[in-house]
Amino acid sequence: MATLSSYDHFIFTALAFFISGLIFFLKQKSKSKKFNLPPGPPGWPIVGNLFQVARSGKPFFEYVNDVRLKYGSIFTLKMGTRTMIILTDAKLVHEAMIQKGATYATRPPENPTRTIFSENKFTVNAATYGPVWKSLRRNMVQNMLSSTRLKEFRSVRDNAMDKLINRLKDEAEKNNGVVWVLKDARFAVFCILVAMCFGLEMDEETVERIDQVMKSVLITLDPRIDDYLPILSPFFSKQRKKALEVRREQVEFLVPIIEQRRRAIQNPGSDHTATTFSYLDTLFDLKVEGKKSAPSDAELVSLCSEFLNGGTDTTATAVEWGIAQLIANPNVQTKLYEEIKRTVGEKKVDEKDVEKMPYLHAVVKELLRKHPPTHFVLTHAVTEPTTLGGYDIPIDANVEVYTPAIAEDPKNWLNPEKFDPERFISGGEEADITGVTGVKMMPFGVGRRICPGLAMATVHIHLMMARMVQEFEWGAYPPEKKMDFTGKWEFTVVMKESLRATIKPRGGEKVKL
């Protein structure tokens, strides 16, 4: 059979694209007649609102906020083949995620790249609502993230906090008292999670190498145009090849670590670097409903990667925003330091002390209200067609929740634009971050798909903020600089200008320059 020329290839591809696009458009048009979808900006055939988002020149979350101001609390965006239904109202979110929780508890189909790294949706966050998800989540929550189990890792957290303080001191000595908050906070959290996940003592070089592997995965998972227009996937074969290469490197690097832990628990006392317990220990022989065998090595890699990536950037980002707010609001920083001194005196803050600090809890809750880790919780989908707010929610829709609209809604909060921890002090405003009694803020999602690591993340944030404020007085860099609270998307919502700050040891001690 004769081969096609380059020109023939082009014509064939263009024709296939046109015919497929026409078929898709006609199918979507026939579908749309069946549903009373929420209103939204009119889009183009085939591509929907993709061009409007691109031409706006704004990040997606800013575009969504603009659309919200025009279309209200529930609206639709057509993003190529995806129908996005976006919720921005607390009552609608509560109705969907709490009152109709089981209906909204599943996930939409993933793009092919994500299924590579989730091992075909075999992770807590990616799994569709069903027996696999229930087995994986139950194991993580009951056997790893319960309050009892978390207490067993107190020494790990204490050690990581000591290393964080020393790291900050060393960095300040080398840089005239200036430190890079996010980088240092992120490494401290990652060290904790690595120890919890693998149950092995590791040197910093190995931890940093694991971190590099995890970052490569996150970068590879950045959205692409073919996520919204799968018809274009053939044009992204190079990117898919790169994703497979990153996955291979991830598996090849992590499997030996997994095997080291397996040998350590099979032969107690044989490995002096092994700790008493780890997340891996709960996974080796895990019985997953509907699955005949225990998780494979590749599935273990995906589950461990989820544990590490899911808990690192969200926590570190919260700490960065928290320190920035303390610098911008020195009265809050002073009051927090006074509470710490009053509670522990001269001794080092530990987790039991943190439980006795109501103002610290108010500060952390306020920073999570003002600066949720992401602008959108992980995408939901419905298990069956349903309605919300008088509109149809079809089974193939992506249900998105725009969290800032809820946390900044004046119907929910007094002076929502102000950073004010006092609102949570006794007699002030209340907020249940789990959303069960009502949704006013949702930094970790709500409902059946709420982040399973919520308790762990809040422990880490409280402890880090307490230790960092106890040890140092935090200031702006340069000193006269006004804090810029503009955010940008980098796996989580980070400060657009990464926070550099000055630190001065408490008690009048000077940082050695």
UniProtKB/Swiss-Prot annotation:
<comment type="similarity">
    <text>Belongs to the cytochrome P450 family.</text>
</comment>
<dbReference type="InterPro" id="IPR002401">
    <property type="entry name" value="Cyt_P450_E_grp-I"/>
</dbReference>
<dbReference type="GO" id="GO:0005506">
    <property type="term" value="F:iron ion binding"/>
</dbReference>
<dbReference type="InterPro" id="IPR036396">
    <property type="entry name" value="Cyt_P450_sf"/>
</dbReference>
<dbReference type="InterPro" id="IPR017972">
    <property type="entry name" value="Cyt_P450_CS"/>
</dbReference>
<protein>
    <recommendedName>
        <fullName>Cytochrome P450 77A3</fullName>
        <ecNumber>1.14.-.-</ecNumber>
    </recommendedName>
</protein>
<dbReference type="GO" id="GO:0020037">
    <property type="term" value="F:heme binding"/>
</dbReference>
<keyword id="KW-0349">Heme</keyword>
<dbReference type="GO" id="GO:0016020">
    <property type="term" value="C:membrane"/>
</dbReference>
<keyword id="KW-0560">Oxidoreductase</keyword>
<dbReference type="GO" id="GO:0016709">
    <property type="term" value="F:oxidoreductase activity, acting on paired donors, with incorporation or reduction of molecular oxygen, NAD(P)H as one donor, and incorporation of one atom of oxygen"/>
</dbReference>
<dbReference type="Pfam" id="PF00067">
    <property type="entry name" value="p450"/>
</dbReference>
<keyword id="KW-0479">Metal-binding</keyword>
<keyword id="KW-0408">Iron</keyword>
<keyword id="KW-0503">Monooxygenase</keyword>
<feature type="binding site" description="axial binding residue">
    <location>
        <position position="451"/>
    </location>
    <ligand>
        <name>heme</name>
    </ligand>
</feature>
<dbReference type="InterPro" id="IPR001128">
    <property type="entry name" value="Cyt_P450"/>
</dbReference>
